Amino acid sequence: MQESISNTPLVVPRSEHSISRANISENALKVLYRLKQGGYQAYLVGGGVRDLLLGREPKDFDVATDATPEEVRKLFRNCRLIGRRFRLAHVHFGREIIEVATFRGGGSEDTEGERHIENGMIVRDNLYGTREEDALRRDFTVNALYYNIADFSVVDYAGGLADLEAGRLRLIGDAPERRYREDPVRMLRAVRFACKLGFNLEPSCERPLLESGHLLRDIAPARLFEEVLKLFQGGTGLSAFEKLRHYGLFSHLFPATEDCLSHEEQAFPITFVSRGLENTDRRIQEDKPVTPAFLFAVLLWEPVRQRYRELVAQDRMPVEAMLLASGEVASVQQPLVAIPKRFGLPMREIWALQPRLEQRQGKRPYRLLTHPRFRAAYDFLLLRAEAGEVETERAEWWTRFQDANGQERANMTDGGGKRRRPRRRRRRSSPSATESAGAD
């Protein structure tokens, strides 16, 4: 098997690259120096090196070393070992976690550890090896760059520096189909990095995407949930959505939604999901919070809405119909992309409030204002109005109602604000003198 990786790496000295320790997390540097002082090799690796070379601020700093996880734990009291598929060491510094991975091996006789492969997919990879073998085990060339704390050089085995310069995303190795089969999540990572970095996928890596989406069904639903968050909560969610659909991957993550989107409604394309993801991207760019509950409410709304309409047509009451539709869609989705309860329950509450937002008379609007999911449900209603799904008048009414004073709210909910005359309590008549006398 011929792999596109060099036995003799390109080593770029400190004077010829742009990475400065001033831009590296202080805690990551502590880990690197402690490993070096312990007699181990220590490298900053992966997306952190890539982003530093691109002039971006890394989100995470990962470390690679020849120390085993157990040896790492002996060096750091604040270390915790995690993972079954990939054994990793997490070194905790308050809220920051530095992930430390032992060099992965290629499977030669002198490597240490174990690897299990089922149907071509690596289900456990705790086989340890050399730095060169570790580079071979990585996914993309731009993620196989090593920053050496010993001499501050950058080590490149796979042509990642040239690909960074060219804006090209390329899988390591000469068999992209096999690399995707080893770990199907690499297909989602290919889409995510292409969107995040603005890079073009190398054609040999792009072609298999169109035929390999079914492999995602072999990935644990909980892991796919985490990958979906990375795809859609990184600021390029709309672009990721469009690429996932282009490569036929979205249908394997959200088949019910894809089925709805593939059919136009009254000769108009359904735009709600696109508008929702565009709104999410904008909020992230403005440093505003976004929640997984709202994101998944957007991604699964079309099948919920369709089933809701069917149930209402069967004479179900709107609130009941929405609860039934929500439950059906969520239960079908759960085996594919598992949504934790802490997000699944508020997601369903956002949906459940939609028919209740149609009720604008009496005390109901006041009660809705105090509901813990009202704001999210209101924002969801605004998106529906933008997509032409509901009348803009309804969304505007709720906007005005929130801003109105007491009398204005009364006028909006009581048709003119006329106060009812309070009913008088009937006074019990006292016994007459005659009756009193007769009682004796």
Model-inferred region functions:
Residues M1-D440:
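Catalytic cores of the polymerase beta-like nucleotidyltransferase superfamily
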